[in-house]
């Protein structure tokens, strides 16, 4: 019986700990490395450095990312040259835990751009500054808890369609303000009031954007059969917000719900991500009435070679009729940079659009994955133009009644060399449709990007 007990205990002792590098590095948890027997990675000695008191330690980490980008006919030919440039990202963080009730997290960022014709965009370059620097007070090691966080921080919720750290571009998005995180039963709830951080090309000179205020409440919980639901409210107050109809002060209230099931990892199964949003508020002396619905439905065959996943996205968001007193243009607020895959920072965004987006993914041996997709896009309202991913106007309607914007086939190859390093290549062509041919030079966008990254 004694030997049986030892055998039963072995799986518990050999339990594999989570060594995931999260999108938000503040969510990395290396406390299990307090046990020296768990230390097996080269970087483990700096992942848990005890500070002498109970539950007191500091953890260090970082990231290096190099990207070669080439864009031909940017903005469908408004810039006809082939623009080739290099983007470099360097990030370093430290996470101090003082007991179970106090935590200080600081993350430095440096984004550098070289060789781009026209110079760096705001998303390309930030010489050196704090990406995050916050103090958190409260104990999360309870069944129900609440903690207060104040300082510079990142926000990322749900699928990232509306609130994201802007991971694709070279410089990530951060905010200055306060946030309360809480757990009540099965609900995880966040509430915040912040201002976006303005990235200026220089050293430690970022400031909050005092023309914009952003606040919200986001709640999520598991439901049943691997399905979870999110409910949220987002508030945005912007001075001089710009749309095709003009510029004015914008007060926008966003109410949304999301139902989702993650991609299958063990047994063959379907996955989905459905999200519906309405937006109300005021724009100048008029009102705001906007909406969107987004869907992503897939199936993963985990029991066949290459573990393929086939999926299709279908999305729609409202556009504007400038002749009415009500602004109908949907705002993506702070969206994910690569929601449409390749062409993330140069193609059209999820504003005034209808799209169908089939995709295929497969897992090859030795950590290599491949994907291929096609995005086909139309305008929802022919009186409104085409907008970029962040929501600013790219091509005005210019009287065109054509609805078809174009289509973009693309492909991606990624080699996850080990848990730290990866190489990736993206390629896409956006073929201009009838609207772009009528309202712009209408040339096809060619896009190539090569990535190399390392996290620790």
Name these PLM-found stretches:
Residues 418-451, 455-456:
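Predominantly the C-terminal beta-signal and adjacent terminal strand-loop region
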Residues 141-148, 161-323, 383, 395-411, ...:
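Signature for the C-terminal beta-barrel architecture of outer-membrane proteins
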Residues 70-88, 98-144, 161-165, 202, ...:
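Surface-exposed loop and membrane-interface regions of Gram-negative outer-membrane beta-barrel proteins
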Residues 16-40, 276, 286-399:
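Extracellular/periplasmic loop regions
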Residues 64-72, 108-114, 152-156, 184-186, ...:
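Transmembrane beta-strands of outer-membrane beta-barrel pores
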Residues 1-7:
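Sec-dependent signal peptide recognition
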